[in-house]
Amino acid sequence: MAEYTLPDLDWDYAALEPHISGQINEIHHSKHHATYVKGVNDALSKLEEARANEDHAAIFLNEKNLAFHLGGHVNHSIWWKNLSPDGGDKPTGELAAAIDDAFGSFDRFRAQFSAAANGLQGSGWAVLGYDTLGNRLLTFQLYDQQANVPLGIIPLLQVDMWEHAFYLQYKNVKADYVKAFWNVVNWADVQKRYAAATSKTQGLIFG
């Protein structure tokens, strides 16, 4: 079974400054994300052993650990692609039209997404996702690394609201961090994810 690996970034750690510091990106990627990768591989190894021993209590424990660490790995893998030193501004084309249709305007979407991020209690993410059943865009608060986002949602844009993502630079002023985040959003990546979600998921989850 192939192991999960830490992805390389498309930009240097300092490339998102002054909006997100190089120190934060280095620790976030090389320490925190790496820990999730190790955690998911460890959980898979222990899960395989538990299944071989028919130890159902250990199976359930490691399935829970797998969900958490794999969620962390997936979320961060999207996060790095969602960011770019050439980001910011607004989306265009089909994604822009879909945002206008779902939220009324980009400014209304930005306000709703920012409110979801700033309003999170504890740790988690704000997510813009594509609902493959309703064929629409929705925003969610994702709790921890894996809770509160329903199955069938394809994540397009995420902002990490765990303290390790911002505290060294923004302290407890989450709103300033979220405001800075918009300056480095890689809309080309979000558009690519939207195009794939709308064209490649028909019938994948719902017949």
UniProtKB/Swiss-Prot annotation:
| Signal sequence coordinates | none
Effect of substituting residue 30 to T: In strain: ATCC 35847 / Serotype 7
- Cofactor: how and how many bound: Binds 1 Mn(2+) ion per subunit.
Record EC number: 1.15.1.1
Q: Which GO terms describe its molecular function?
A: metal ion binding; superoxide dismutase activity
Q: Which cofactor does it need?
A: Mn(2+)
Keywords associated with the record: Manganese, Metal-binding, Oxidoreductase
A Pfam entry, by short name: Sod_Fe_N
Q: What family does the database annotate?
A: Belongs to the iron/manganese superoxide dismutase family.
| Name of this chain's protein | Superoxide dismutase [Mn]
| UniProt organism field | Mycobacterium intracellulare (strain ATCC 13950 / DSM 43223 / JCM 6384 / NCTC 13025 / 3600)
Q: What is the lineage of its organism?
A: Bacteria, Bacillati, Actinomycetota, Actinomycetes, Mycobacteriales
